[in-house]
Every structure is written in structure tokens, then in C-alpha cells.
């Protein structure tokens, strides 16, 4: 394991709480006006996926920290969960990069980006939620 990962005891309660927060954020995304706020929708999608991946890590008994931790969580998912296609992993990584540009450079996303990626992002979110629920049983 990498030095950015800390081995911990699996934490089901924290994972449940993160799952609940992600589901609340997903509900909120449905209310975002994509014509006016596509960048906000993209950021929120990324936050949901990042949180769900961190819940998977928690259930596997890991935490990440430090510079590049988000990138490492995506790599962890790619290496350890083959149910995610290369295309899906690439979409998550693209979204991570885009979210950083939005947050740090004031970059604006076009509505078209969100509508083109929505199906893939929903698929990733569905897989992550299913995985977490299975691990919580």
C-alpha cells in the first residue's frame, strides 16, 4: 500500500453516514438548473463520487491523506474493483481534474459536458452505492 493510505479498522457507521450525505447531495443535484449552473452540478457530481469512494476505502479499512489523496483513491478503485471500466475510471479522473479547474481557476463548464457525462457518472454512482450497501450487510 502507498504511504498516503493509512490502515484502519473498517468503519461501518462512518461509511453509512457518508453514504447518506452522498444521497442527500444527489437529491440536491436534481434541483440544479443546468442552463445556469452546470459548473456547480459538475462539482457536486465529483463530490458525491469522491465521498462514495472514500466510504468504500473506509469499509476496506483504509483512509487517505495529503496532497494527491483524491487521485490515489481513484487509482485504488481502478486497481481493486474491476467492475469499473477503464472508461468509467477515466471519466472520474476527468471530473476530478475539471473540479480542480472550477475550484481553483474559476473555470466554467458548459451544460453539454454535464449532459454528455451524466449517464456514465450515474452508472459509477450506482455501482459505488451498490458496493457500499453490499459491504454494509
Report residues per predicted region.
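Terminal alpha-helical segments
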Residues: 1-137
